[in-house]
Structures are given as C-alpha cells and as structure tokens.
Amino acid sequence: MKTQIVILFISMIMLQMFVQIEGGFWGSLWEGVKSVVGKRGLRNLDDLDDLDLDHLFDSDVSDADLRLLKQMFR
C-alpha cells in the first residue's frame, strides 16, 4: 500500500510539472489563434493586404553594401 501511494504521489508531481511546462506553450498558441481569428485580427490582416510589401520591407541596398556582402561571402 505504501508503494502505491508513493507511486501515485510521484506521478502526480510529474503530471503537474508537465502541465505547467505545456501550459505556456498552449497559452501562446491560443493567443496566436485568437489574434488571427478575432475581428481585430482579421481586420489587421486585411489592412496588411492593402499595403504594398515594398513599403514593409525596405530593400535599399547601396553599392557599398553590395561590395561588403561580396567580400564577406568570398
């Protein structure tokens, strides 16, 4: 009987540790889903589609930058 109680106690501790670790992951995943599926999230995605991607990612690379990159990758 003592062995069963000890095994039960240890398994409960291990289960609690697992739930606490996974709770952060599942919480983050749920927040991401809520932000995408919610009304504001969908509205923000529509606003993102209206923008030109060139405005989001500025790709101004000067000749000096290109020379430096070529030297780095030799």
UniProtKB/Swiss-Prot annotation:
UniProt KW Membrane keyword: yes
Expressed in which tissues: Expressed by the venom gland.
Residue ranges of the propeptide: 41-74
Modified residues (Valine amide): V37
GO biological process: defense response to bacterium; killing of cells of another organism
Domain of life: Eukaryota
Entry's family note: Belongs to the non-disulfide-bridged peptide (NDBP) superfamily. Short antimicrobial peptide (group 4) family.
Protein name (Swiss-Prot/TrEMBL): Amphipathic peptide CT1
Species of origin: Scorpiops tibetanus
Biological classification of the source: Eukaryota, Metazoa, Ecdysozoa, Arthropoda, Chelicerata
